[in-house]
A protein has these predicted regions:
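The feature marks the mature, well-folded catalytic cores of soluble enzymes
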Residues: 26-377
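N-terminal export signals
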Residues: 5-26
Length: 377
């Protein structure tokens, strides 16, 4: 298969991104823990989420609402896509999602007027400064315990390895949101984006070596240390390591949410291709082998459901919401139909809805990348 793009990023765009990212990484220092105190968020610094009995629930657990962020122009200028088209696709996702659960949309003060015009009146707006619109990565990862309480894992955000400065407002977004929502936050001096991990809610976490072992995130690449940070912060018990994410991906460095996702405890959806000439063939086969050889935190062998690769975007980058699954689709009807058919079988109790995500793909993401759930307690 001739894969001109991954998630819809053209070859020329990739080249410019790669050179720009390299320059940005040299010019912008990779920062550590931000100063959260001016946000007024309640910080929990004396213990860890796991020690306090908190964990990050699976995406299919009931949501109170979903956090999204209306993208500003900053990182879209070089894509040659009208900003109205970009925001229009965000609005398509948000408006459809709002039919199934509440949506909290973060907007810059100067964008409030356009937000009121393009979003459903059911969507709540909150004003904060932001640098980009990928709430999966910059938003808070909300944890729960058995007492009906919520706290947040405040991982550090550094603009995907310093590639897209400035990112200081995005680095503070989780703290500002937690203050707004009155949710205490554990400040974690470790860089992690939400799209880099997937959990099953029963102690198992999926990730990729390509992202988490990348020194543009954290200097330490010792697996045991990384696993300890993840388990202590997200309440997981076992980390399953896949190798690389799909290629090419100069932005996220192989986020798991473009390659694989838990569908339920013990079941993993995995993108695969039968085209041996596809550079992703070996990546997908390696991921499949690792999953088949693994057991989860409960000792179960994993059931791996293969989802055929689309030439233009990642169908795996779906979002499991209350009573529905929102799936990125492209202009390739045959690829869409195959993916949607498989997902309808996997999620029989939810309505599977395909939404055009080609513009999201041009920016290197999908529906999962622009959504972050707040679990119901």
């Amino acid at each position: 298969m001739d894969r001109r793009t991954f998630l819809g990023i053209s070859g020329s765009t990739l080249a410019s991104l790669a050179s720009g990212a390299s320059l940005a990484a040299k010019e912008q220092k990779i920062e550590s823990l931000p100063d959260y105190k001016p946000t007024g968020v309640k910080l929990l610094t004396e213990t860890t989420p796991a020690a306090d009995g908190f964990h990050f629930p699976a995406e299919w657990a009931a949501h109170e609402f979903t956090v999204m962020v209306l993208p500003p122009p900053q990182n879209w200028i070089g894509y040659g896509i009208p900003l109205d088209d970009v925001r229009g696709q965000w609005a398509d996702v948000a408006n459809k999602l709002s039919e199934y659960e509440a949506v909290l949309m973060v907007v810059r003060p100067e964008d409030k007027a356009i937000a009121k015009r393009i979003f459903s009146k059911d969507i709540q707006l909150v004003e904060f400064p932001v640098n980009d619109g990928w709430s999966r990565d910059s938003g808070p990862m909300i944890l729960v315990n058995g007492k009906g309480e919520r706290r947040a894992a405040g991982f550090t955000f550094n603009g995907w390895g310093g590639k897209f400065p400035p990112y200081q407002d995005d680095a503070l977004l989780k703290a500002r949101l937690c203050k707004h929502l009155d949710i205490p936050m554990y400040p974690i001096n470790w860089v992690l984006e939400g799209g880099a991990v997937a959990v099953d809610g029963e102690g198992t976490l999926l990730t990729t070596e390509q992202c988490l072992l990348n020194k543009n995130r954290n200097s330490a690449t010792d697996r045991s240390k990384i696993e300890k940070v993840l388990n202590n912060s997200l309440g997981t018990k076992k980390v399953i390591w896949l190798g690389n994410g799909l290629e090419p991906d100069p932005i996220t460095d192989g986020h798991i949410d473009g390659l694989a996702a838990f569908a339920s405890p013990g079941m993993v959806l995995l993108h695969t291709t039968k085209d041996r000439n596809d550079p992703n063939f070996a990546i997908c086969q390696d991921a499949k082998r690792r999953l088949k050889e693994s057991t989860d935190a409960q000792g179960r062998k994993l059931d791996v459901i293969e989802l055929p690769l689309d030439a233009d975007l990642s169908h795996i980058n779906f979002y499991i919401a209350n009573d529905c699954v929102l799936v990125p689709i492209s202009a390739r009807r045959r690829d869409n139909d195959r993916a949607l058919g498989i997902l309808r079988e996997v999620f029989p109790k939810r309505k599977t809805i395909g939404l055009d995500a080609t513009v999201l793909g041009e920016g290197g993401g999908g529906i999962h990348c622009i959504t972050q759930q707040v679990p119901k307690v």
